[in-house]
Structure formats: C-alpha cells, structure tokens
Amino acid sequence: MMPTIEDNLLCWGKTYDWKDNGDEWSQAWGGTEYLWYGTILPRILSFVPTGNILEIAPGYGRCTQFLIKLCKHLDVVDLNVNCIESCKKRFLDSSHISYHINNGKSLDMIAKNSIDFILSWDSLVHCEADILNSYLSESARILKPGGWGFIHHSNIGQYYNSATRNISSKNIHARAETMTAKLFKEFCDKADLFCARQEIINWGGDILNDCFSVFTKSTIDTHYDTKYLENSEFHKECNRIKNIADFYKM
C-alpha cells in the first residue's frame, strides 16, 4: 500500500509516541551523534556551514540540533503540528529558527532565491513520487543560484514488477513504492535543477531500497553530470560506526 499524506499525518502526527524524539532510529549507529558525524556530515560537508538552511520534515529535531550550529538562519517545515511544536520547545533558546507547518508538498512560505542548502533525512523515504516532484519544483524556486540540496528518498520503486503490479521485494521499512533514483533525476531535469550525485544504498536489508540525492540550482556557466554510486555495503558503514561508538562509550 502506498503511503498518502493522510497516512503520514495519522502515523507521525497521532499514532507514533515519539518517546525518544526519533533517536530510536539512530541505534544502528550507536546513537544520533554517531549517525550525524559518521554518516550524514561527511556527505554534506561541501555545503555547510552556510547562510540559510531549510530542513524538510525534521520530526522532533534529530538533525535540527546539528543544523542550527551550521547556519545563520534555519527554516524547518513539517506536515505535523506535533513535530513543529516539539522543535519549538526543544530549540527555544535558538532565535535564528523559523517554524512552518505545510500541506505535505508545498514550500510556499519560503521566499524565492533565499535558501543556500536544503536537507531532508529519513523522512521523505515515506513519500511517493508526486510529493518529491512537488518539493523539487519548489526547491528550484527557493534555492539561491549555486545553492544545494541533499534529500534522502525511496528507491524501492526500482523493484516494481509491471506483470504482477507489485514490488518484487519485501518493503519492510515502509518505503514509498512509486519513487526511484531515476525519477528523482527526471524531476530535477524538469525543474531545471542539476542532480549531481546519487548514492543508492541498502537500508536495513539487502536490496537497494533508498537513495541519497544531491542537487543544485546551478549558475548558467556551470554544468554537472550525474555521478552514481551503488553502495550495497551501507550496512557495513553503520556497523563500523556502531562498533566504534560501543567501544569508546564510557
């Protein structure tokens, strides 16, 4: 079954208890700090620190806590009221954050040509192709020329079987079944964005069910050819970081 905006509202806005503020999803790395410094930051280090950052679907602030130290101003946008309210309380002492509740696909509250870097981690994996298409169209409007984005999204649609009209592999992590790395690049092309990097990974299993896509609103004299990496050993990266975390934790 494909998750809808209503499904995401029900799950993350009402059903899920968020007792650990989302840190429970960092256990494979040994904790959120190890996830951030071992996996996320090395992949975005070319783009931060910077001026204005937008985080899409921050949840309860798992990545937000690090982004606030890497920018002059941070916008956070989430579909769920409870997520935004939690972030407001958690980051009460940070005066350079603006909070927005959206409809799950629009960024109309963000000004044109105002954002240097966009990040979304471990959230849009549950959003179907039409949502990613909308967010990339909006990204083209709000990014400054030369601005960049890093979005973690589903690739499980790669395993769609047209004969059976089903995904041929088990979708144990509730990934959006219409989304693929190929579609992400097509959406970038349509929005006049350059998709510069795509790392297709195995998240919590053996299949290449996820993708990290890096894109830019390039200046007129710059062109990027997409570089691809099929990383079927992403789980080994997580395990290595967790082993280090477990060994050195006191």
List the predicted regions and their residue ranges.
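A short glycine-rich, Lys/Arg-flanked "PGG" loop and its adjoining helix->strand segment in the class I
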Residues: 133-145
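Class I (Rossmann-like) S-adenosyl-L-methionine-dependent methyltransferase catalytic domain
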Residues: 1-50, 56-108, 127-134, 148-250
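Conserved acidic functional residues
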Residues: 64, 112, 122
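A short acidic, Gly/Pro-enriched loop at the edge of an enzyme's catalytic core
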Residues: 108-118
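A short SAM/SAH-binding and catalytic strip from SAM-dependent methyltransferases
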Residues: 117-130
